[in-house]
UniProtKB/Swiss-Prot annotation:
Protein name per UniProt: Respiratory supercomplex factor 1, mitochondrial
Protein's organism: Candida dubliniensis (strain CD36 / ATCC MYA-646 / CBS 7987 / NCPF 3949 / NRRL Y-17841) (Yeast)
Cellular localization per UniProt: Mitochondrion membrane
Coiled-coil region: 111-142
Pfam families, A to Z: HIG_1_N
Amino acid sequence: MSVRLPSSMSYGEEEEPDVLQKMWEKSKQQPFVPLGSLLTAGAVLLAARSMKRGEKLKTQRYFRYRIGFQLATLVALVGGGFYYGTETSEHKQIREDKLREKAKQREKLWIEELERRDSIIQARKQRLEESKKELRELAKQGFIEEKESNDEKED
């Protein structure tokens, strides 16, 4: 019989957000950063297209747009970092509190699981001892009966 050891993972645990969910949340916090990134990428694509067509003036204009969009994206990123910097420390404290609470919950579940398994083991040991006791009594009775039957045969 295979017995699984108790896991330190809680069963009702919510999953950590994946990369796309994290990106979506950060994009909602700082919407100008992804917008600037998209505009920069668009400017580079337009510059590449105009370069392929041989339109030098449009190519230069699109590369200048790219520089402007990159600057705006960088300003939005730094500004958002300063703005959300204090809020981030508050979020960090809240997250640490949640992690501590989750660790306490896991420890509690772990202890409950170990106690449950220990009670099962103790019950099995008790049943084993009772079975051994019954077998000894049956063996003793059988031995006594055999002895009595041997004594009767000898008489």
